[in-house]
Amino acid sequence: MNTLAAIEIRPAIASALKDGLPVVALESTLISHGLPWPVNLETALAAEKAIQEQGAVPATIAVLQGKLTVGLQEPELHDLAKAEDVLKASRRDLAVAVAQGRTAATTVAATMFLAHQAGIRVMATGGIGGAHRPSANPWDISADLFELARTPVAVVCSGAKSILDIPRTLEILETLGVPVIGYGTEEFPAFYVRSSGQAVGCRIDSPEVAAKICLEHWNLGGAGLVVAQPPPVEFALERTEFEKALALAEKQAAEGNVRGPALTPYLLDRLADATCGKVLKLNRELVVENARLAAKLAKELASRQ
């Protein structure tokens, strides 16, 4: 059985792809691991709505009881948002989830992989994974970075999560040959913070230019790209405010011996507490804005087929 045959592409998504319509993939770890109920469901639905309003088709991806699924329906989003014991699946975990009949939420890496297999060229997320800070674990490097180096999908995001070592993350992306494009910015966003202080490879200010860069990159045999736009200014945190909250969260994680896949969700939970929930509102808003931009990019790509 080939990979495509193992994926259930829902009829609305399959029809859109067949007709050359713009489709945007959405990851699902945000729903199961990134945000609490009911903010997780509200955010997922708002992201899909933002894509539809731009004239594109949303395709949330997950593993449902062992079935690789592209294009979750609203009742399934609801079930995933309330479910417990949901596996957090990167690309390496997909076979385990399928073989064991598990329900799993897909990370950026797994979503990219499945989106590409389905024929989708653009995905949206809050932020990509990256290299953790040395104070956490210098060897903890997200599979997202390596997936970007081998899978031709454009990932629209607000940079890398602020809890990461962003300079090192950008160095790895450069080494892997992954273009990092700033949308409306010359500095790489840091998820909760509008700027990390690190320069991007280039700045663009329109979906048209983004589409041209994507197509040229793919024509040259390139794989993934990062299109990073800052979080909405009215919701973003100040860098000093964030760093103070993060220092406390990292201290608590070290004291509790929290590491591995559990570290990022733990730190995000502590940050939500330390900022009195401000990061939850910000997370929702930036995901929706990224979904909107991804839809515009997908439309430009579709018009150039």
Regions found by a protein language model. Give the residues of each.
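Active-site glycine-rich loop that binds ribose-phosphate moieties when present
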Residues: A105-T107, A136-A149, V153-E174, S206-K212
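Solvent-exposed alpha-helices and their adjacent loops that cap or buttress functional pockets
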Residues: S15-K18, V23-V24, E53, F113-Q117, ...
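A C-terminal functional module that forms or caps the active site or interfaces directly
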Residues: G221-E289
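N- or domain-start disorder-to-order transition segments that initiate the globular core
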Residues: M1-G20
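Glycine-rich nucleotide/cofactor/substrate-binding loop typically near the N-terminus or early
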Residues: S28, H33-L35, L41-V96, N219-V233
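Anionic-ligand binding region
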Residues: Y192-W218
